[in-house]
Amino acid sequence: MHARTRYDYLASDRSQFLEEARQASELTLPYLIRGHEEHMSGMKQLKTPFQSVGAKGCVTLASKLMLALLPVQTSFFKLQLDESQLGEEFPPEMRSELDLSFAKVERIILESISASDDRVAVHQALLHLVVAGNALVYMSKHGLKVYPLNRYVVDRDGNGQVIEIVTKEKISKDLIESQLPREVLEINQVTDDNEYSDNVDVYTHIKRDNNRYVWHQEVNDKVLTESRGKAPIDINPWIPLRFNTVDGEGYGRGRVGQFIGDLKSLEGLSQALVEGSAAAAKVVFTVSPSSTTKPSTLAAAGNGAIIQGRPDDIGVIQVGKTADFRTAYEMAGTLERRISDAFLVMNIRQSERTTAEEVRMTQMELEQQLGGLFSLLTVDFLVPYLNRKLNEAQKKGEIPKIPKNIVKPTIVAGINALGRGQDRESLSQFLTILAQTLGPEAIANFINTDEVIKRLAASQGIDVLNLVRSMQEVQQEAQAAQQQQMAMQQQQMAVDAMKTPVMDPSKNGEVAMMEQQAQQQPPQ
């Protein structure tokens, strides 16, 4: 069966999710999701929402997720030894050398990510996940490419495993004319609008074949000669992502869809407030028919001008809807706060006594809401993304080949980073309570400082290798400092002894005689 036929067949299952995504996009970021088969071929007038709360929430949530999944300063993964595969006589020196090698590999991968535009593509994919609930990421040799929901269809089994993916995109004929005969490319060169087009519809068909994925591209039901590819499941470059999953559904649902009611209500109230405020701001004067003041005289009068007439004959039209506007304004404020909390937009209490601790607790409560999102994205995105990155680096020779049975990559971002943050808070509170209850001496007597430093570093995701001195090094330096201090004390005691009256020749005759005898003694 041709890829175009499969795409049209599977598009019927996608229509409901695509329509919900389009409605969610209209209230937040209208440019993200277009119609059923609309492409970015020309300018289209998009409807602008009357409120920007939804757009701000989507951008904020996507940015927080991106920084949590791919942090800038720290690594999102670590290479660790599988303890079950190592012997008990494994020397600690060898383990330290391996840790240094692993750290070098991690730096190489992070440098390659920083040099590419992966974070830009990941942020775009997360925006689609927040709004539409679905996105397809393709990891090519040139970087990441994001497919919106209206450009691909997917088929999954009962367990949610991907069976088939078909994408549709428009590509210039000049790029693929060497792979197909000219007469094939000339088919359907006139669009539905009776306009000549230099682009053709290219369908990419990805199917699962046992423990691997195979794919090819078709144009007008003809396979492109250089488009075939295959990859094992664990390093598959096609990564379909879902935000919220429902058992039995092949597509996900976005964060916006969960709070679409509040967004629609806020949109209606914002429109009413904006239009009502514009009507109330309009100034219209009325003149009594029996007044001596003519409307033309009033209209022509400048600022500060003097005209003839009575003030009672001139009035101003007032809307008189202040109470109604106040009710709508208060309800809109309530909806805005609820939407901001849903999209993890931190609202600090405006007061003169807002403390840093209150801000920190508010931020921590917002981060704890990301637990479920981190868990899903860690499994669906970070694991295949890391496997593909490591495989490409090994093929290019940038890093040595990693034995899978001994070394295993572990994700330390996302939900794991959130758990480390909670461990840090618990440890800090424990030490603070211990110092306040038993005093600082108790910490020095009962707490293992070396272990505290290691746990705090682990909670921050910091590698302590060659950074923090070991207890043996600290003890050696303390012993050397103590010996140096004792030597200085002995030297000072000798100097002080020379200054005592017993050793002073002017005050002790015996010492003076001994010095004279030493001077009179001839040299040998």
PLM region spans:
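Long, contiguous amphipathic alpha-helices that act as assembly "spine/axial" helices in icosahedral shell
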Residues: 31, 58, 99-141, 251-286, ...
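Extended, helix-rich architectural segments
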Residues: 1-185
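Short, mixed-charge, low-aromatic patches
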Residues: 57-68, 77-84, 93-95, 216-224, ...
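Structured, contiguous alpha/beta core segments that scaffold functional sites
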Residues: 8, 139-300
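Flexible coil/linker segments and helix-coil junctions enriched in charged and small residues
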Residues: 87-91, 185-192, 434-438
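C-terminal anchoring/interaction modules
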Residues: 1-20, 25, 286-524
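Short, hydrophobic/amphipathic alpha-helical patches that form generic packing surfaces
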Residues: 63-71, 260-279, 432, 451-458, ...
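Charged, low-complexity, helix/coiled-coil-prone segments
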Residues: 2-8, 37-55, 63-75, 93-96, ...
